[in-house]
Amino acid sequence: MDLLNALVALTNFVIVPGLAYGSQLALGALGVTLIYGILRFSNFAHGDTMAFGAMVTILFTWLFQSVGLSAGPLPTALLALPFGILGTIALALVTDRTVYRFYRQQKAKPVIFVMVSLGVMFMMNGIVRFIIGPGDQRFTDGERFVISARTFKKLTGLQEGLAIKTTEALTVITAVIVVAVLFWFLNKTRTGKSMRAYSDNEDLALLSGINPERVVMYTWMIVAALATIAGVLYGLDKSFKPFTYFQLLLPIFASAIVGGLGNPIGAIAGGFIIAFSEVTITYAWKKVLNYSLPDSLAPDGLVQLLSTDYKFAVSFAILIVVLLFKPTGLFKGKAV
Amino acid sequence: MTETMKHTLLFVFVGVMILLEGMTDFLFFSGSWNSALVILNMGLISAIMAIGVNIQWGFAGLFNVGIMGFTALGGLAVVLVSTPVIPAAWSSGGVSIVMALVMGALTVVAAVMITKFMPAGKLRALVLAVVLIAGFFVYRAIFDPAVGSVEAINPALQGNIGGLGLPVLLAWPAGGLLAAGAAWLIGKTALGLRSDYLAIATLGIAEIIIAVLKNEDWLSRGVKNVVGLPRPLPYEVDLQSDPSFVERAASWGIDPVTASTVYVKAGYALMFTVVLLALLWMAQMALKSPWGRMMRAIRDNETAAEAMGKDVTRRHLQIFVLGSAICGIAGAMMTTLDSQMTPGTYNPLRFTFLIWVMVIVGGSGNNFGAVLGGMLIWFFWIKVEPMGILLMELVTSGMAEGSALKAHLLESASHMRLFTMGLILLLVLRFSPRGLIPEK
C-alpha cells in the first residue's frame, strides 16, 4: 500500500506536471528548430512570438466570453486558438517580408540574423506590453480538473491524491495531435518534402526547382502556429505574463540544442529531457521516500536537490554538458 | 564637412541635449540640473558597458548576451568589498561556507581530471558519477547548516557574511575581476563552438547569476537588498549641515539642498568620466596595436588567421574575459552610484539588450562610436517615455473625454520604450549597419 502511495505521489507531483511542461517545451523547441533548419539562425524572438500568439488568443477568448460563447467543460481559449494562430501567422509573414527577407537576399551571416531577431524581439515585446500590459492575465475557464485529488482518494481509498488538471490533459493531447500532424506534413506532403530538402541542402534544392521564398513562407506559417499553440497551452496551464515568455527562451533553446538543432525529433526529446530534469531536481522527495523506504531510513530534510528558483540552472547545466561532450546534440543536429 | 567634424558634432549634440535637460522644461525636457546629471551619470556608465561589448563584438565578433550577469557580479563585488566586516558571521558559519564552496569546486575539478586522464568506458562513467554525487552531498552537508547559522545573525539588517570593510573604490576593479572569472568559465566551455551557442550560453549564465543573487541570502541578502552601501562622496544631508558648504552655496545664490545634490552628482560624473577616459584610452591603444589588428583579422576571416598560426580560441577567450571585466567594472560603478544592491531590478531587456542597441547604433568596431551610442541611447531610453506620452496626448486629443481607448492608450504610452528601441535597432541594422561613427 505504501509503495502504491509513493507511486501516486510521484505521478501527481513529478510525472503529470513534467509531461505537461515537457509538451509545452517540445512545441516551443520545434518552432526554434524549424527556423534553425530552414532559415539557419537562432530566433531570439520566439518567446515573444509565443507571447503574441497567446495574447491574440486571450483577446478573442475575452470576446467569446463576453458574448457567452463557451466550449463546455473545455477552456474557451480552444475556440479562440484558430484566430490567435491566424493573427500570429500574419505577424510572422509581415515581419519576414519587412525585416528578414532583406538579409536573406544579402546572404548575411547567421549572427546578423540573430541580432536582427533581437530587434524583432524588442518590438514584439513592446507590442504585447502595449496592447495587454505587463501584468498577469488569467483566461482559463471550464472544468478545472479531469480528476481532483479528493475524488481520486475516494475512489481508491489511498492516502495520496492524484489531481490531473484539464489544462494538463489538454496540453498533452494537443501536443500529440500537433506533432503527429507536423510529422505527417513534413514526411508525406510535397511542401513538407521540399522543406526538408531545402533544409538538407539549399543549393541542390534550388537546382531541383524548389522556390525558396515559398519554403520560407510555409516555415513561418508553421512556426507561428506552433508558437501560438505552445504559448496558449503554457498560459492556460500556468498564467500569461509577457516577461515569463521571454524567460522561457532559455529552456526552449536548451531543449532544441540538447536534441540537436534542426532536428524535429530531437526537439521533442529535448523538451521532455529538460522538463523532467527541472521537475525532478527541484522536487522535494521527502514524501515519496517516506512512503517507499522503511521508517528507519526515512529522511529528515525535504530531500530537495535544488530550490525551485534554480530551475533555469538545471536546463543550463544540461545544456553545457551536452555542448561539452556532444555539441551536435543527442539526435545529430546540423550545428557544430 | 570632414568625418572628424561630423563625429564631433554628434558628441556636441548629446552634450547640448543634456544641457537643455538642465536648463529648460520645454516639451520633454524637465528643466532640472539634478535630472540632467542623473542622465549624464548613467550615460557614462552605459558608455563604459558599451566599450566592453564593443571590445567583444566590434574587435572580435563575439556575441555576448549575458551582459546583465557580469554587471550584477560587479554589483556583488561592491557588497563583498565595501560593507563592514561581520565577525559573528565568520565565526558562526562563514568559514564553513567557504570550505563548502572550495569542496564543490574541488569536486568539479576532480570530475574534469577524471574525464581527462581515465580511459573512456563504463568504469570512467561510474567513477565520475560516484565522485559527482558524493561531492554534491558532502557539499550540501557542510553548506546547509552554515548558511542557516549565518542567516540567523541579525536578519533584519544583516544575515549575510558581510564584506571586507575596504574603501568602496577598490570594489570597482574587484567587480572587474569577479566578472572576468565568470567570463573565463563560460568562455572555456562555449567558445570554439558555433557563434549562436555563445549567445545562448551567456544568456543562461546571466539568468543563473541573477537567480543566485536573488536566492542566496547569506551572500548579499537576496531580494531583501543591501542598502546604504558606503559611498566615495559625502552624503547630501551632511553637506547641508556643514556651515562652510552652506555659505559657499549661498554665495553662488543656490539653496543648500539643490547645491548639495548637484554637488554629489557632479562628483560622481567627474569620477565616472575619469574611468571612462582611462578605459577609452586603453581600448583605443589596444585597437591600434598589433594585438588589435590580429583580433580584427581573426574576426574578418578565422580560417585565414588560423592558417597564419593564430590560436583563435585562445584569443577569443582572452578578449571575452577582457570585455566582460569592463562590464563588471561598470556594474560596480552603477551599484556605487545607487549605493544599494537590488537583485530584483536586473532585467535583461534593460541591462543586456539595451547595451547592444547602444553598440550597434554608435558603430560597432569603433570605441568612440560605442561611447556616443551609450550616451545617446541612454538619453532616449529615459526620454522616450515623456515623448511617448506627448505623442499619445496628440493622437488622443481628438477622442472623446473618458473613452476607454483613450485611457488605455495614455496608460500604455510608457511601454513605447521597448518598441522604439527595437525599431531603432532594426532601422540602423538595415540602413546604416556600420552605425553613426563607423569603424575606420
Give the location of each predicted region:
Chain A
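Helix-loop-helix "hairpin" substructures at the membrane interface of multi-pass membrane proteins
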Residues: 21, 160-240, 245, 264-270
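Transmembrane helix-bundle core of multi-pass membrane transporters
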Residues: 102-103, 111-188, 215, 283-312, ...
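Single transmembrane alpha-helix segments in multi-pass membrane proteins
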Residues: 10-60, 94, 98-112, 203, ...
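Membrane-embedded helix boundary and interhelical linker motif in transport proteins
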Residues: 16, 39, 45-94, 158-161, ...
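Alpha-helical transmembrane segments within multi-pass membrane transporters and channels
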Residues: 68-120, 269-273, 278, 323-327
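Membrane-interfacial amphipathic/re-entrant helices at transmembrane-helix boundaries
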Residues: 1-28, 56, 67-79, 106-111, ...
